[in-house]
């Protein structure tokens, strides 16, 4: 009896199919033909193939970790769990990792059996989006990713396994699908959830069958999760007993047909289910000979650091950065391929210079010289955007020599050392251990190792800050982070020269050191401090000559001194009224419950309002509202704010849903997290300012992101009441008024717009009057609102369609308004045209101070892409110059405020928040206004609105 034949797919043969590899664009494309490695593995190359079942690991991570979302509400816990395991496995140099996903189409098993996998629970609604993010990160990091149309990930993994075994590789499979047990042998093992390895012995011990019998066993028992029927009434114990007695499924059925199989009840069940068993056998049998084009011995394909950084920033997965950096550093463990799976943490490396500098040979280092200023620091923080992070390593580099700073082990490590007699009672000297005693010993040893690993994670070995005593500045990559870390612990230093700031001025796409090191030195950014110091020193010699005079001046007078200002702001933090925010959260919760009740009443049913899918069904199917747009990712009818706003008046449920979403986001992003982010030692909130994250030169902030606290909603404004002044102080808010419009008037050199600002007119009322041909006194609120919308929207390429939607006016009326607007202010149109011409000719646009942004998309043949780049191009000189002006004002203000006992706390958009002694409030307010308004002289005056109050809200 042949169970894989008769029209079914054989485990040993299958029609050839094309292997498809997911392209960087996200579309399926035929894979590149990669050279096959025919020889045995090179000792210098990976010798272990790690195959990850992508969907299985994503599901495992989703349910293993508590829900986690970023500030935008996007769930990320499956992404975090998946990537941490992937990076952990990939860090070991002996491993080549390949990720395999199920295709988004049905496979041949679905065609054979309509009910295949129909018994599985519905996929959580927020998981597919996370899986797509995982795909994008895997691609960006350069890990091979395979998806084979018509076949499951299991089949691809099975085929890769047999290919790898034929070339002498060890294979480790990360999957929760027990079908993989049919692949196991002495060289192929499955990595279990607890990182133990499952091989033939473990399968036989647990299930009572050999791996060669596994498909027969599954054919008898079936698989409820895949809706594979098996033999009705035959359970695992009976199936194992039958195979132990008869050896194979074929022999079992020979005995059943001959009448020799006992008991009769079992024989009858087998014969009644014979067709189902045959069918189950076919479904369980993996395909092992797919013609996959993959190169063995290559750890990673070319990666894309820019895409990786964009994804990490967008998803706010900052904890993954050190692990990603570690991909290119020294491996943590030895060459034994299973070490990493059996140990939670790496051994501490020896602290000699040769071991500390794996990326460079000694002769090469000797040729590298540091800048004239002297020693350059390299360092490793456990987290680079958190002042509570631990300084894990530091080193200096000078004249070709790297010297690691000594690391001190915390006292807590002693708690992890096992007493000498811990295993004494398990090791009697007069007789060998029993099996039970051996297991108890192994468990105790593993528990002790886990305890050591956990304590080393909670209390890592760190650099003694005394190493930095006597330093006035620290020259390093991302020097602000190191200076802030030291200063908050009492060793006050200033950030010195920083290659990241040089690189950021050369091209704002240079947002982090992995990108910079690769781009300018063709080096990977290492995980160890000595090599980081060496690369930093070399970059500080290579990058400055690349700057022109304008950007060199920006470095010396703006970015470098600002780095110190921002570091001090981070160390100071801002005081937060946690009780107030918690009360506000409770009130928001009450309102959310009320909104939920009203929404359900209008819907006529209860549903999960936070679920886009369920909300889509209620709004567009049940209530039959008109859908205005579809999502790019899934093609579903959109429930985003931009899609619901035009429907606000179409049904009373819409404004309730919009309010629910806003309240829910504010509560989850600010009200609940902020009190937990307050430093228990200082009692203040310490955000981190990102100086090199935004292409226009603007600052951004992390942990928390204070740039996105809304000010238009009532609750958004209320949140600002939670930011308070210290006792004896008051808060002062200084906000540039309409700075981008004023800069537009200056740069576009439009006389009519300049005149309005010089005369101190209401620019929006003046615009409405001039465009509509009215007297300013007769302009009503709606007309002024239309003019305001166009004034601000023109910098972002506002179309007539957008204006029509925003104002609720006919398209023709909106188009006419924009046409007359440009006729009224012809300098604006000239500015746009000139900027685009300049960008096409030079490849970049720039601010008044010379900050550049490169705009290659201006020559794109894709109209949508080109028009988006055009909007970016003529917006950047305005927005970027506004950012430059704010930075200069901060640099000038900082020492003057310090001299009178005041201090800058926050910078948000065009606003500064300052804390001043109560008796100096008027003096500080006047000083701030004067400095900010006179930091640069334009053809129109800069205007700064200043207010004081006990909290941020009351400064307005």
UniProtKB/Swiss-Prot annotation:
Domain of life per record: Bacteria
Knockout consequences: Increased sensitivity to ionizing radiation (IR), lag time before DNA synthesis/repair commences increases considerably, decreased rates of both DNA synthesis and DNA repair following IR. If combined with a temperature-senstitive mutation in dnaE (catalytic subunit of Pol III) viability at 37 degrees is dramatically reduced.
InterPro entries: 5-3_exonucl_a-hlix_arch_N, 5-3_exonuclease, 5-3_exonuclease_C_sf, DNA-dir_DNA_pol_A_CS, DNA-dir_DNA_pol_A_palm_dom, DNA/RNA_pol_sf, DNA_polI_H3TH, DNA_polymerase_1
Biological processes annotated in GO: DNA-templated DNA replication; double-strand break repair
A GO term, aspect molecular function: DNA-directed DNA polymerase activity
Broad EC category: transferase
Keywords: DNA damage, DNA repair, DNA replication, DNA-binding, DNA-directed DNA polymerase, Exonuclease, Hydrolase, Nuclease, Nucleotidyltransferase, Transferase
Listed EC numbers: 2.7.7.7
Family matches, as CDD domains: DNA_pol_A_pol_I_C, H3TH_53EXO, PIN_53EXO
Subunit structure: Single-chain monomer with multiple functions.
Role this protein plays: A DNA polymerase, required for DNA repair after DNA damage induced by ionizing radiation (IR); this is not the major DNA polymerase. Following severe irradiation (7 kGy of gamma irradiation) genomic DNA is fragmented. DNA is progressively degraded for the first 1.5 hours after IR, in a step promoted by RecA and counterbalanced by DNA Pol I and Pol III, followed by massive DNA synthesis and genome reassembly in the next hour. Optimal priming of DNA synthesis requires both RecA and RadA, Pol III initiates DNA synthesis while both Pol I and Pol III are required for its continuation.
Protein family per UniProt: Belongs to the DNA polymerase type-A family.
PANTHER family: DNA POLYMERASE I (PTHR10133), DNA POLYMERASE NU (PTHR10133:SF27)
Name this polypeptide is given: DNA polymerase I
Species of provenance: Deinococcus radiodurans (strain ATCC 13939 / DSM 20539 / JCM 16871 / CCUG 27074 / LMG 4051 / NBRC 15346 / NCIMB 9279 / VKM B-1422 / R1)
Gene: polA
